[in-house]
A protein has these predicted regions:
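Substrate-binding/gating loop at the entrance of the active-site cleft, primarily
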Residues: 15-26, 37-56
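A short helix->loop->beta-strand "cap" motif at the edges of active sites that frequently abuts
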Residues: 33, 54, 117-121, 126, ...
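Active-site phosphate-binding strand-loop segment of PLP-dependent enzymes
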Residues: 62-137
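Aromatic/hydrophobic pocket-lining residues that form π-stacking "cages" and hydrophobic walls in ligand
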Residues: 45, 111, 142
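Phosphate-binding glycine-rich loop
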Residues: 1-34, 177
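Active-site PLP attachment segment
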Residues: 144-180
Length: 180
């Protein structure tokens, strides 16, 4: 559970994470509202907004360092600019596919603050949560952060990646508050 308590009534079942994203775009964003996707990204995240009548706004990551090592980082200024321009949703992947990085609590908290300030929902793909290989790191669910507004937070996950059972076709979409 990664220290995050989820009630059964907060969970909906869908075939996969991608259909969860399509459902959230269709139900919780305005027609034509842009969808923010930090890049690099899992390619279908860049295609699904267009299939749902929305523009995809790519926000390229920035290169930074942590403890002297290079790393990909979210461009929080770019995300904020896209939110201020009227974006309807931020798609976040944590751990970040394809860069394989676990987002730290400072980044998650910054995203939560932006989401709340602009009223922009966050769809978080956490399908890779069980695959953190660095023993010094651990996955922190975005929705578990104190600033993540439950009315603006959607978390998708599935056993398909961590346990290599994609044929099962059973993802979980977790939402609470008015997001349900």
């Amino acid at each position: 559970t990664f220290g995050w308590q989820v009630e059964a009534e907060q969970v909906s079942l869908l075939p996969d994470v991608l259909s969860s994203l399509s459902a959230i775009i269709a139900v919780h964003t305005r027609e034509g509202s842009p969808i923010i996707v930090p890049t690099p990204a899992y390619m279908p995240f860049l295609e699904i907004p267009g299939r749902n009548g929305r523009d995809c706004v790519e926000v390229p990551s920035v290169h930074g360092t942590q403890d002297g090592s290079p790393r990909w980082m979210l461009d929080l200024d770019g995300v904020e600019s896209a939110m201020a321009a009227g974006a309807g949703l931020l798609v976040l992947c944590n751990p970040w596919n394809p860069v394989g990085r676990v987002l730290d609590t400072a980044e998650l908290d910054a995203v939560a603050a932006l989401s709340s300030a602009y009223g922009v929902p966050v769809f978080v793909d956490e399908i890779h949560a069980p695959l953190v290989l660095d023993e010094h790191l651990s996955h922190v669910p975005y929705a578990s952060r104190p600033g993540a507004d439950p009315d603006l937070t959607f978390t998708a996950t599935a056993a398909s990646k961590g346990w290599n059972i994609p044929g099962l076709k059973c993802a979980q979409l977790i939402a609470s508050g008015r997001a349900r």
